[in-house]
Amino acid sequence: MSLAKQLRKRRQVDARVINVHEWADDEGQPFTFYCYPITCNDLKVLEAKHKNFLENTTVSAMVDLIILKAQSESGEKLFNAGEDRAELMGEEITIISNIAEQMFATIVSVEDAEKN
């Protein structure tokens, strides 16, 4: 096993809970899904489709991030790039940007990491 693989196995990474109050059910419970931290591979996929993803994050890129990372509690992907992408692109921008912001919150800046 490579050193990089050994080091990655040492880390315990928990999924982040994402709550979308605007998608609440009839009882008022927000739609909840899970998202693991954004990885280098995720950024590679997003940058291939959306140049300068981190510097110029478009709504389309946010939708692709949601499709890429959103999972059920059991780890199943929730959205697909076909029909779901078209539906998500029709959603209000504030909802999409709020979800993407919660997903980006899993990224810890160098400055914040140094504080810990």
Q: Which residues are covered by each model-predicted region?
A:
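Extended acidic low-complexity intrinsically disordered regions
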Residues: 1-14
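Generic cytosolic/nucleocytoplasmic N-terminal low-complexity/intrinsically disordered segments
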Residues: 4, 18-21, 48, 114-115
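Residue-level marker of intrinsically disordered, low-complexity segments enriched
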Residues: 11, 15-18, 36, 57
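Short acidic-hydrophobic surface loop/beta-edge motif
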Residues: 14-28
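Short, surface-exposed, charged amphipathic helix/loop patches that serve as local interaction elements
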Residues: 27-116
